[in-house]
């Protein structure tokens, strides 16, 4: 997953998606894998996989009936949010954790890191297009850092496209 974060390759992507299913298949209903410290490695890998598949974004408040997924293209990120029940909350984007938490000048590869996928530049302008028309427009990174308010009815889907700024 760390390698894929830096070098997107379709064969590597397919292998990761295949192998995570093997890992998930090992998990018992209790959540335990093998009952030793290696379970922590599994949990870390599962978190890394989840961060990749959401491009680092998350929803607040969390609800088990609300799902988020994301994909990236060369200059865009697509976020899809679905809710089984009515839900109101915010889509929160990841931050440049290497800078804001670890005080590192660059996001260099490190053992046990959680890769950064889509992070905001607070001084940039982002373009958003969505099937929820009220979300369409230009946003400053510092405003997006606070989240995007979303309201979903039961079984509704929200699609949001965020275009990277031109630098």
Name each region found by the language model.
Residues 1-166:
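Glycan-recognition and catalytic cores of secretory/periplasmic carbohydrate-active enzymes
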């Amino acid at each position: 997953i760390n390698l894929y974060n830096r070098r997107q390759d379709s064969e590597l992507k397919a292998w990761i998606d295949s192998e995570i299913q093997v890992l998930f298949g090992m998990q018992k209903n209790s959540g335990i894998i093998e009952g030793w410290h290696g379970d922590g490695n599994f949990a870390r890998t599962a978190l890394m996989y989840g961060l990749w598949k959401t491009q680092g974004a998350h929803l607040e408040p969390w609800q088990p009936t609300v799902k988020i997924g994301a994909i990236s293209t060369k200059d865009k990120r697509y976020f899809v949010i679905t809710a089984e029940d009515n839900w109101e909350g915010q889509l929160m984007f990841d931050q440049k954790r290497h800078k804001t938490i670890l005080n590192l000048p660059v996001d260099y590869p490190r053992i046990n890191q959680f890769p950064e996928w889509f992070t905001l530049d607070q001084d940039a302008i982002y373009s958003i297009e969505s099937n929820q028309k009220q979300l369409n427009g230009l946003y400053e990174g510092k405003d997006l850092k606070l989240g995007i308010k979303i309201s979903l009815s039961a079984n509704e889907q929200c699609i949001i496209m965020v275009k990277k700024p031109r630098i």
